Amino acid sequence: MTLYKGGLSRAECSAMRGVAILGIVLHNYSHWLKMAVKENEYTFIQSNADGIWNAITNVSWYLPIHLLSFFGHYGVPVFLFLSAYGLTLKYEAPQESAWEFIRKHFAKLFMMMIYGFALFLMVDRIVDGPHKYHMMDIVGQLGLFNNLLPDPDHVIWPGPYWFFGLMMQLYIVYRLLLYRRHWGITVGLMAVCFLLQCFCDPQGDALNRLRYNFVGGMLPFAMGLLYARYERGLKQWQYALLAVVSLLLIVGWSMEYQAWFWVPAAVCVFAVAMVKITPKRINDILVWVGGISSAMFVCHPITRKIFITISRHGDIYTGLLMYIVA
């Protein structure tokens, strides 16, 4: 079996995690504000796309909020890309049973999730506007299968914790279908997942359910796997060109339904290119942030619940700054 070396250093991977977690954390705060342009994450709403274009072309004091609200969730595809990248480098040479692999990664996700979930349940009851849980909602979160339950928009709480169920599904798909398999299997699964989505109603429940589960995350995950196997490296000017082109594609593809499915691919290309060309001083900061990304992800729904009321009462950037500091 080939030992893949990959094209990203540990520091570059950590810097990408830093960028991704900042996007996710700031998005999850910003999109709770009524004035913010809402994202197209699980479904595609044309008015949201039109709204961000209007915000970009008519710059206001709140443009950063609009950009974070609309684009920040694309930190998730970067994490999926890096997860597959790391799995390929770490596990494709050693032999390990499918059951042992799945058991170990379930335990890893559960231990990362449970402390934040337990604390959030307490904070949620204390702070105004507590969520009404049903028993199956909690069981689904503890079992990391709540993405599969009906109406995931209202079942999964805190909302960002849908990522744990998504990652568990992708771990299973990787080990059972993609582990040490021909690249054609990976590309074929990407194509199947795309076709399952592209014929759906842009605002329909079917698309919403698919994108809460591994079907919606397959593109960046598969890209990470293939990149780990076949990346050969580029020159600095080529990475710079890729960064510019991919950034333009992120914005352009976000405006049209069928093109929107490919935005995560452009986001992953942009993230890789940026860490390759970003000055070391900035990358060092991102590496540090990436090192605490797991803690930030687990804790940020709790701090959001506490500080969001400040921004909702008019002090938008004051609340956001307190949220960042906390």
At which residue positions do the language-model features occur?
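Membrane-cytosol interface segments of multi-pass membrane proteins
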Residues: 1-193, 313-326
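Interfacial loop-to-helix transition and helix-capping segments at the boundaries
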Residues: 11, 63-76, 152-166, 200-223, ...
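Hydrophobic transmembrane alpha-helices
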Residues: 81, 85-92, 170-178, 220-232, ...
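Hydrophobic alpha-helical segments of polytopic membrane proteins
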Residues: 179-192, 226-249
